[in-house]
A protein has these predicted regions:
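Aromatic (tryptophan-biased) beta-strands that constitute blades/sheets of beta-rich domains
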Residues: 2-11, 15, 19, 33, ...
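Blade-level signature of beta-propeller repeat domains, shared across WD40, Kelch, NHL, RCC1
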Residues: 200-243
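Repeated scaffold domains used in trafficking and secretory/extracellular systems
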Residues: 2-29, 35, 68-80, 110-121, ...
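Short loop/turn segments that connect beta-strands within the blades of beta-propeller domains
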Residues: 17, 25, 45, 81, ...
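Structural recognition of the beta-propeller blade-terminating site
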Residues: 53, 98, 137, 175, ...
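Short glycine/acidic-enriched loop and turn motifs that connect beta-strands
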Residues: 20-21, 39, 169-170, 216-221
Length: 243
């Protein structure tokens, strides 16, 4: 089975599911392929990774750190220069791998795994499940700062901001490089009255507007109750905030 990860025209975007895409600066890598063994008899199992560059270069290597389940959910984080690939794990933190050889450059150690990853110029923002947002030095993996949150993940909005349910029933727009909140909403405000629904898509539409969508399961055999809301975010209206 091959899992292909393509990159968007404007951003280097790696896809798990469409609703969980992650945004990165346009970069050197064009495509990543994961080839999983047909028979898996042990865990963790080796995955063959093919990294294709826009220059035409292509490298193939094997690793046990890049888990397909995570790729499907959260994508593959890479640096814009194409030198590093970041591998999330369920229990053992975050790995930084050489994109051309698969060699381990550094890893973080924690009791919780890592879900989303946002790659900046000299830092990485990652989420430790439902514990904290962490800023890491991109060269060493050293923790620069962290902020406690209750959610299991975040959504990248553009080159600068993320959206996160930082506390129960409280959504925040956070500047990735500083972990500072620039806009805060109650769950009712953020979903425009659908606070008991599950939010599964947040997109920045430009001009300070967010598109928020979600659903609520129905237990009577009927289709899910779905909603879509347009939410104003004045803090993202300025040209600088557009990223």
């Amino acid at each position: 089975m091959i899992k292909e990860t393509f990159f968007h025209e404007e951003y280097s975007v790696t896809f798990g599911d469409d609703w969980n895409s992650c945004l990165y600066d346009r970069g050197a890598i064009e495509k990543i392929e994961l080839n999983v063994p047909e028979i898996i008899d042990k865990y963790p199992y080796p995955v063959t990774v093919t990294v294709a560059y826009r220059s035409g270069e292509q490298y193939c290597w094997e690793t046990k750190y890049l888990e397909v389940g995570y790729v499907r959910q959260f994508g593959v984080a890479v640096t814009a220069d194409g030198n590093s690939v970041f591998a999330q794990t369920w229990e053992n933190g975050l790995y930084c791998l050489d994109a051309r050889t698969g060699a381990k450059r550094w890893r973080t150690k924690s009791r919780r795994g890592v879900t989303n990853v946002f790659v900046g110029k000299d830092y990485i923002l990652c989420q430790q499940h439902n514990r904290a947002l962490q800023l890491l030095d991109i060269q060493t993996g050293e923790v620069l700062s962290e902020r406690r949150v209750t959610s299991w993940g975040f959504t990248s909005l553009n080159h600068r901001y993320i959206a996160c349910e930082a506390r129960v029933a409280r959504w925040e727009i956070i500047e990735a490089a500083t972990l500072k909140t620039v806009q805060s909403y109650s769950a009712r405000e953020f979903t425009q009255g659908h606070e008991y629904h599950c939010v599964n898509l947040i997109q920045y539409r430009g001009n300070g507007m967010l598109r928020v969508s979600g659903f609520q399961n129905r237990h009577d055999g009927l289709p899910n109750d779905e909603f879509t809301a347009l939410v104003s975010c004045p803090a993202m209206e300025s040209p600088a905030a557009e990223g």
